[in-house]
């Protein structure tokens, strides 16, 4: 019978090397095996090319059966929530992407309450995550919290509309807002830059909190630092979306064909589509971390405070009931004591009368 050889643990050849440097590789393998989850919300008026842009970003068709409503249907139309989930795999890395669309936003004549449905949806996802996180089985929690919101701004105005301001202020403490100027091919380069500056000025004027890209670390390479600088300078992103392949300069590109030429979707000289996609991919982890550490924690703290106040009120009510019961008990004891005293006086009075009557006889 052969003797089994013991497992060999070999000392690293490099002096002073323990092996901790391999830990990131372990995390990477585990993350790749598990896959990634990301939820993107798109909000904006109809006709701004939201669906086309999302399909262009992820090279997929998320809305194959969508029916475009007519003008008459839009008059009384209410905001709906449509969540579409698709599994995307690229070089062995899986991404579970959920895109939350909001058809009907801004379509009705009276848009005063049109964003309440959207806010309720965001809060519901926080509430669901809090419930799952507090449960017994926390191993397979699906994260449907909204990590980023692309807010589409019309290129045909002179800046932000009152509805834009009201909506962004209503959600800026709940989700990461990335402002996007839609249909940038309707603007000249000068008009585009002027509109960007106007929007940024109004965002600052109304104290709207949009998503700010983190600064590049000092140890990052110069190319990444330059990329981060260009991405920051491009906000709000002015984009063009198209799923059509056309021929330009002897090659097939996605773009739009006009009598005066071709607008290429993925040409950074024509629009900010590539910059927007680069921002989303390179900062996807940061968007999730800000959602977890800032927006979700704010919701969780407020939720626990409300729960704490409820418990506190219940305790106060219980204390009040006990005090009232104790006061009622004291009143009854005092009443019984008075009755006993009266009965004792009556008995003493009766005994004295009987004694006087006996002496008289």
UniProtKB/Swiss-Prot annotation:
<comment type="similarity">
    <text>Belongs to the TRAFAC class TrmE-Era-EngA-EngB-Septin-like GTPase superfamily. Septin GTPase family.</text>
</comment>
<dbReference type="GO" id="GO:0015630">
    <property type="term" value="C:microtubule cytoskeleton"/>
</dbReference>
<feature type="region of interest" description="G3 motif">
    <location>
        <begin position="101"/>
        <end position="104"/>
    </location>
</feature>
<dbReference type="InterPro" id="IPR008113">
    <property type="entry name" value="Septin2"/>
</dbReference>
<dbReference type="InterPro" id="IPR016491">
    <property type="entry name" value="Septin"/>
</dbReference>
<keyword id="KW-0966">Cell projection</keyword>
<keyword id="KW-0131">Cell cycle</keyword>
<dbReference type="GO" id="GO:0005876">
    <property type="term" value="C:spindle microtubule"/>
</dbReference>
<dbReference type="GO" id="GO:0051258">
    <property type="term" value="P:protein polymerization"/>
</dbReference>
<dbReference type="GO" id="GO:0005930">
    <property type="term" value="C:axoneme"/>
</dbReference>
<dbReference type="GO" id="GO:0035869">
    <property type="term" value="C:ciliary transition zone"/>
</dbReference>
<keyword id="KW-0137">Centromere</keyword>
<dbReference type="GO" id="GO:0005737">
    <property type="term" value="C:cytoplasm"/>
</dbReference>
<dbReference type="GO" id="GO:0005525">
    <property type="term" value="F:GTP binding"/>
</dbReference>
<keyword id="KW-1003">Cell membrane</keyword>
<feature type="modified residue" description="Phosphotyrosine">
    <location>
        <position position="17"/>
    </location>
</feature>
<feature type="region of interest" description="G4 motif">
    <location>
        <begin position="182"/>
        <end position="185"/>
    </location>
</feature>
<feature type="binding site">
    <location>
        <position position="241"/>
    </location>
    <ligand>
        <name>GTP</name>
    </ligand>
</feature>
<dbReference type="GO" id="GO:0060170">
    <property type="term" value="C:ciliary membrane"/>
</dbReference>
<keyword id="KW-0221">Differentiation</keyword>
<dbReference type="Pfam" id="PF00735">
    <property type="entry name" value="Septin"/>
</dbReference>
<keyword id="KW-0282">Flagellum</keyword>
<keyword id="KW-0007">Acetylation</keyword>
<feature type="binding site">
    <location>
        <position position="104"/>
    </location>
    <ligand>
        <name>GTP</name>
    </ligand>
</feature>
<dbReference type="GO" id="GO:0042802">
    <property type="term" value="F:identical protein binding"/>
</dbReference>
<feature type="site" description="Important for dimerization">
    <location>
        <position position="156"/>
    </location>
</feature>
<dbReference type="GO" id="GO:0030234">
    <property type="term" value="F:enzyme regulator activity"/>
</dbReference>
<dbReference type="GO" id="GO:0003924">
    <property type="term" value="F:GTPase activity"/>
</dbReference>
<keyword id="KW-0744">Spermatogenesis</keyword>
<dbReference type="GO" id="GO:0000776">
    <property type="term" value="C:kinetochore"/>
</dbReference>
<feature type="modified residue" description="Phosphoserine">
    <location>
        <position position="218"/>
    </location>
</feature>
<dbReference type="GO" id="GO:0007224">
    <property type="term" value="P:smoothened signaling pathway"/>
</dbReference>
<keyword id="KW-0132">Cell division</keyword>
<comment type="subunit">
    <text>Septins polymerize into heterooligomeric protein complexes that form filaments, and associate with cellular membranes, actin filaments and microtubules. GTPase activity is required for filament formation. Septin filaments are assembled from asymmetrical heterotrimers, composed of SEPTIN2, SEPTIN6 and SEPTIN7 that associate head-to-head to form a hexameric unit. Interaction between SEPTIN2 and SEPTIN7 seems indirect. Also interacts with SEPTIN9 and SEPTIN5. Interaction with SEPTIN4 not detected.</text>
</comment>
<dbReference type="GO" id="GO:0060271">
    <property type="term" value="P:cilium assembly"/>
</dbReference>
<keyword id="KW-0472">Membrane</keyword>
<keyword id="KW-0597">Phosphoprotein</keyword>
<dbReference type="GO" id="GO:0061640">
    <property type="term" value="P:cytoskeleton-dependent cytokinesis"/>
</dbReference>
<dbReference type="GO" id="GO:0005826">
    <property type="term" value="C:actomyosin contractile ring"/>
</dbReference>
<dbReference type="InterPro" id="IPR027417">
    <property type="entry name" value="P-loop_NTPase"/>
</dbReference>
<dbReference type="GO" id="GO:0043209">
    <property type="term" value="C:myelin sheath"/>
</dbReference>
<dbReference type="GO" id="GO:0007283">
    <property type="term" value="P:spermatogenesis"/>
</dbReference>
């Amino acid at each position: 019978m052969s003797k089994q050889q013991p497992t060999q643990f070999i000392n690293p050849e490099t002096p002073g090397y323990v092996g901790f440097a391999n830990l990131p590789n372990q995390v990477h393998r585990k993350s790749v095996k598990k896959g990634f989850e990301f939820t993107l919300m798109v909000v904006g008026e109809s006709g701004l090319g939201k669906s086309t842009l999302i399909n262009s970003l992820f090279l997929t068709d998320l809305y194959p059966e969508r029916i475009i409503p007519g003008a008459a249907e839009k008059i009384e139309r209410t905001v709906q929530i449509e969540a579409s989930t698709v599994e995307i795999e690229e070089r062995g890395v899986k991404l579970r992407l959920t895109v939350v669309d909001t058809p009907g936003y801004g379509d009705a004549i009276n848009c005063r309450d049109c964003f309440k449905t959207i806010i309720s949806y965001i809060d519901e996802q926080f509430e669901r995550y809090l419930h799952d996180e507090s449960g017994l089985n926390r191993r397979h929690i699906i994260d449907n919290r909204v990590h980023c919101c692309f807010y589409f701004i019309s290129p045909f105005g002179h800046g932000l509309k009152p509805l834009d301001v009201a909506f962004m202020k209503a959600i800026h403490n709940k989700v990461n807002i990335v402002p996007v100027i839609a249909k940038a091919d309707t603007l000249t380069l000068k008009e585009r830059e002027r509109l960007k500056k106007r929007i940024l000025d109004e965002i600052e004027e109304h104290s709207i909190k949009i998503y700010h890209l983190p600064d590049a670390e000092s140890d990052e390479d110069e190319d990444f630092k330059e990329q981060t600088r260009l991405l920051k300078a491009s906000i709000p992103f002015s984009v063009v979306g198209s799923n059509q392949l056309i021929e330009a300069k002897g090659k097939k590109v996605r773009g739009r064909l006009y009598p005066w030429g071709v607008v290429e979707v993925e040409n950074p000289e024509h629009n900010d589509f590539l910059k927007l996609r680069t921002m989303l991919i390179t900062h996807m982890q940061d968007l999730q971390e800000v959602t977890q550490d800032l927006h979700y924690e704010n919701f969780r703290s407020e939720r626990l405070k409300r729960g704490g106040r409820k418990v506190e009120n219940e305790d106060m009510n219980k204390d009040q009931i006990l005090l009232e019961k104790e006061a009622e008990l004291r009143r009854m004891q005092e009443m019984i004591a008075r009755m006993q005293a009266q009965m004792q006086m009556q008995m003493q009075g009766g005994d004295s009368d009987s004694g006087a009557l006996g002496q008289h006889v």
